[in-house]
From Swiss-Prot:
It comes from Halalkalibacterium halodurans (strain ATCC BAA-125 / DSM 18197 / FERM 7344 / JCM 9153 / C-125) (Bacillus halodurans). InterPro entries: Antibiotic_NAT-like, DUF436. Belongs to the UPF0340 family. This is UPF0340 protein BH3766. Disulfide bonds: none annotated. It comes from the Bacteria. Signal peptide: none annotated. Pfam families: DUF436.
Length: 188
């Protein structure tokens, strides 16, 4: 039987196949450690579950260079934990709060304690996201979200969904969405 860490590693691998993420990308992660442990969201926050999931996410970050943003719970209006340098580089405004298990959630609190120089920001526009336990990360994704199906549908007992974003297609019937020979003929 797979551990929750192994399950998350599988999910991350599936996301990477669908949308290769790198150091230029931002990944939002929403987690209910209660749901992972088989309890109702917000009722049984677990540091141990958070630590296991963080290990997989940190390993993924080390391999890909992707920036991580951990969504807090609704008590903090789903604000996010990020590294200060990433938040500043992206122009995100810091807010004055520190997550704790009962107001922020175990996952965001754990990430806050592990980051080098953590800050909390109110909102972001991430390139991709993973939602473990139906925490509703969509408000932090760039438009247009493209759902990604994983080979597994749960981490522990928590339902898992993923998405990456793509640029909006604009222009109508005469618009072109791929480079053509015509583009090459305009090169000098």
């Amino acid at each position: 039987m797979m551990t929750i860490q192994q399950q998350l590693e599988t999910v991350l691998g599936d996301l990477q196949k669908a949308k290769p993420l790198s150091s230029k990308h931002l990944l939002v992660i929403g987690v209910s450690t209660s749901e992972v442990a088989g309890k109702q969201i917000g009722t049984n926050s677990s540091k141990d579950v958070a630590a296991a999931l963080y290990a997989a996410l940190f390993s993924y970050q080390q391999k890909t260079g992707v920036a991580l943003a951990f969504q807090c719970c609704e008590h903090l209006n789903r604000a996010l934990v990020m590294e200060r340098d990433e938040a500043e580089a992206r122009g995100y405004e810091e807010v004055a709060v520190i997550p704790v298990r009962k107001a922020g959630g175990a996952m965001a609190t754990y990430a806050f304690t592990q980051f080098r120089d953590p800050v909390i920001v109110e909102q972001i526009r991430a390139d991709a996201g993973i939602d473990i336990g139906d925490t509703f990360i969509g408000m932090h994704l760039k438009r247009v979200a493209v759902p990604v199906r994983s080979s597994i549908s749960a981490i522990g007992d928590a339902h898992v969904t993923m998405a990456y974003s793509r640029p909006k297609l604009i222009g109508g019937v005469r618009a072109n969405y791929e480079r053509t020979e015509e583009h090459e003929s305009f090169r000098c």
